[in-house]
Amino acid sequence: MSVFLLTSQRNAMRALASQGIFATDCHAQVCSIIAQHLSPAHAALIAEPQHDPGQQRIDWYAGVNGTATPVSALPAEEAERLRARAGELARDILHLSEQWGKDAQSREALAGQMLALVLQHPHEDDLWSVDGQPVLVNWGFAPGAVGAMPQDLSRMGGAIPVAAAVAPVAAA
């Protein structure tokens, strides 16, 4: 069973595509590739989009069960841990994308392009936690304003801050 996260308005975003194929139309394929070549946790990072028949709204679902919380509603330390983990997973996906996209003539080139597009999203608050598992909504979209660039999840996070500094060892 999937966990509902939120509904997005399509008119507030611009869909990203490669070779005329919208990234969100390839959810099942990219998640299969990610799970096969990386891990189920990597694949769970990518929320499942459900477009309404009129293509005006998108319902987003997590592929894991649990309590869903937007990153903006988490305590600061927990939010930073989630962002760091999301960035780590995203960098692995980006690396796979780069490997597959090296040869523009290969069968994997389009899949590599799609893997890169799933890391693009319009706003920093597109990240959710489902019982600690990072889940990205609104992926495959850029902000609606003409010329506005999407966020790149692979640039999120970084090193988790150390709680206490380790004292240097004195030379004997």
Describe the residue ranges of each PLM region:
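Cytosolic/nucleoplasmic/matrix-facing N-terminal domains/tails
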Residues: 1-171
